[in-house]
Amino acid sequence: MAGTAGRQDDDRPPGDRARPVERERRPVERERRSVERARRPVERARHWRYEELPGVDLLRARYVHKTFVRHTHENFVIAAIADGVEVFHHGGSDVSAGAGALALVNPDTPHTGRAGVPEGWRYGAVYPSPEVVAAIAAETSTLRGAPGFVSPVLDDPATVRLVHEVLRAAEEGNALAADTLLRVAVTRLLRLNGGTLPERRPRTAGARTAARARAVLEERMAEPPTLERLATDLGTSPFALLRAFRDSYGMPPHAWLTDARVRRARLLLDAGTRPAEAAVAVGFTDQPHLNRHFARIVGVPPGAYQRERKNVQDSR
């Protein structure tokens, strides 16, 4: 037939004819996905102490998919966001801190944490103890009572830079700079966003019951009672205890217990206890159980946490 010279009819079904093209596309698609994965920010974190800053924990981190469950800290949280956005639940609502802002959490205040943008967030944080902050406040402010932060988010690039300079000085072993910059940063934060924390003395019958329940859980951390048994022993009902406990501590008893177990595990790890032994001592079933909860609260696995503590001790 005219116009068919040099062409052979392709008797294959249409689906089979397309397959060579699809095979050609696959390597290109795999390469594209590989490039996209390489461009994604890598999660990393270092949680450590510097012996010349007693009473202060330090953290540098980049998180993308990390989600921090509701938890508390015994120390203050002063987190300086370098880029990205962190969203955290605090005081009954979600708040966000972006680049140039600080996320500020007072001791024993329940909060969460997660990425507010697809690329996550990168930040540096210092965790000074209440005693450290109180000493700085007594010397540099007119605050009376226990000092703390009023707002959980403060846009202040100058203090963000100070916090990162504290971390850099600690990494370089510059004790004079680290101590000086920390004091300047805390003083500035108290001036811009400082206030007096309310007393935590239990004033209502429900609060007193919650405090008694907390004491029982601390004492029986490894083998806690059921909610019903705990309520019966305290002379109340399970739901009444649940409401009172949540009102007093911002989370139900079982969530508070997990948080408390991680806190105690940190103390054991600081003292040199092996992670597997620490897990059982605080009531977790095994080390993987501790690993999961520890990373969701502290931000790093217990093994990495302990190695940094050991490095500090070995350097003395």
Residue map of PLM features:
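N-terminal regulatory/effector-sensing and dimerization cores
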Residues: 2-14, 18-20, 46-145
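Long, intrinsically disordered low-complexity tandem-repeat segments
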Residues: 19-38
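Short, Lys/Arg-enriched N-terminal segment that forms or immediately precedes the first helix
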Residues: 63, 194-201, 243-249
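Sigma70-family region 2
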Residues: 112-116, 192-193, 246
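Amphipathic alpha-helical segments enriched in hydrophobic/aromatic residues interleaved with Lys/Arg
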Residues: 139-199
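A short, Lys/Arg-enriched amphipathic alpha-helix from helix-turn-helix/homeodomain DNA-binding modules
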Residues: 152-164, 177-179, 196-234, 256-274
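Basic/polar phosphate-binding segments, predominantly the helix-turn-helix DNA-binding elements
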Residues: 215-218, 223-260, 279-308
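C-terminal edge and immediately downstream basic/flexible tail or linker adjoining helix-turn-helix-like DNA-binding
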Residues: 310-316
